[in-house]
Amino acid sequence: MTRKLKVDLFTDVVCPWCLIGSVRLDKAIAALPEDVEVEVENHPFYLDPSVPAEGVDVGHMLKTKYGRDPQEMWARPQAEAKKSGVDLDLSRQPRMFRTAKAHTITRLAKSRDTQHALANAIAEAYFLDHRQINDDEVLADIAAGHGFDRDEALRLMNDPRELATTEQLAVAAANQGIQGVPFFVFDGKFAMSGAQPEEVFERAFAELLKPEVASQ
């Protein structure tokens, strides 16, 4: 008998820790017994809702906000990414962009059973391929490989009603107390924040699979 679990995952595309956290989550899922099936539902969150349409220079923003050398701040996430087999060089993606359209097409991929794969693909395009994910054409190219017709993807990511729904969900996540991402909710039973070590994800699933927890 298949045991079904669910993970609600709150991320923002332009958050390097979200990329790392998603990789670690997926590794933990891949290591589960074959009779355990995990649904991952991605939810929108905005690291900075005030980012202008043209984006901002990440290095300048970090230096202005924190008064530190961006290379120094990038060192830790890059090192953590390497531990999980991800070759991350944050200096090669100099700009942070608005993510409403990326979140919208990701949200709408849920009905096509490609949502988590699409979310990962967009994050990888941004951080690893250094693509401009504020560009509709770039997003449409990625979506076309995950169950969307290209023209349909362009229409949906620019639909004012769909964008408004995404905005409402992102605001609701913040209002529920989520202050940083990645943020994980495991089967509605407990939550975890941050790109924790891989063994922490493994322990979380082991806890969920305990008979006394499963019956709650």
Where are the regions that the model predicts?
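C-terminal cap of thioredoxin/glutaredoxin-like
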Residues: 3-10, 14, 20-34, 38, ...
